[in-house]
């Protein structure tokens, strides 16, 4: 599937099973040939900033990972049956290279490496201002929700 116009938040909500406060994709700019470019706008209003860390707010690495996992599901657009959900099955080679703070725009890039028999893998990268914030491979299982 190739995306000609960006998916706005209402379209993202139709595609993902997640809801507030766990929707970590705000927009999908492109999907083509198993590759996705999506966006998470990071604001001070995120609930996790109250505790991580009150005097120096930093987006937790596990939530950057979750944002990449959610973006990865758009690599499968058109390949999943209605009612199927992608479940996180593993993470390989995760590296966190810079802090993500309020005001950052987190660009999420995912490339589908394979999808066979309900198991898949994406290579992912999160960037802020063109600088890599995190990179990893995400393994997932697709099953009925």
UniProtKB/Swiss-Prot annotation:
Name of the protein described by the UniProt record: 3-hydroxyacyl-[acyl-carrier-protein] dehydratase FabZ
Main function: Involved in unsaturated fatty acids biosynthesis. Catalyzes the dehydration of short chain beta-hydroxyacyl-ACPs and long chain saturated and unsaturated beta-hydroxyacyl-ACPs.
GO annotation (BP), single: fatty acid biosynthetic process
A GO term from the CC aspect: cytoplasm
Organism: Deinococcus radiodurans (strain ATCC 13939 / DSM 20539 / JCM 16871 / CCUG 27074 / LMG 4051 / NBRC 15346 / NCIMB 9279 / VKM B-1422 / R1)
Active site: 52
Highest taxon above the source species: Bacteria
E.C. designation(s): 4.2.1.59
GO MF term (any one): (3R)-hydroxyacyl-[acyl-carrier-protein] dehydratase activity
Main localization category: cytoplasm
Cell compartment(s), UniProt: Cytoplasm
HAMAP family for this protein: FabZ
Keyword Cytoplasm among record annotations: yes
PANTHER family in UniProt: 3-HYDROXYACYL-[ACYL-CARRIER-PROTEIN] DEHYDRATASE (PTHR30272:SF1)
Gene this protein is translated from: fabZ
Family assignment from sequence similarity: Belongs to the thioester dehydratase family. FabZ subfamily.
Positions of disulphide bridges: none
Keywords: Cytoplasm, Lipid A biosynthesis, Lipid biosynthesis, Lipid metabolism, Lyase
Keyword Secreted: no
Pfam families found in the cross-reference section: FabA
Catalytic activity field: a (3R)-hydroxyacyl-[ACP] = a (2E)-enoyl-[ACP] + H2O
């Amino acid at each position: 599937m190739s995306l000609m116009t960006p998916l706005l938040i209402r379209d993202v909500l139709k595609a993902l099973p997640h809801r507030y406060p766990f929707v970590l994709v705000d927009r999908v700019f492109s999907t083509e040939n198993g590759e996705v470019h999506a966006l998470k706008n990071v604001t001070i209003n995120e609930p996790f900033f109250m505790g991580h860390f009150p005097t120096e707010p930093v987006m937790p690495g596990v939530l950057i990972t979750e944002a990449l996992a959610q973006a990865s599901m758009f690599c499968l657009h058109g390949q999943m049956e209605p009612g199927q959900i992608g479940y996180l099955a593993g993470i390989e080679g995760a590296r966190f290279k810079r802090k993500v703070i309020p005001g950052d725009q987190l660009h999420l890039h995912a490339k589908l490496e394979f999808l066979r028999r309900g198991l898949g893998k994406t290579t992912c990268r999160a960037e802020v201002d063109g600088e890599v914030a995190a990179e990893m491979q995400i393994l997932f299982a697709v099953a009925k929700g």
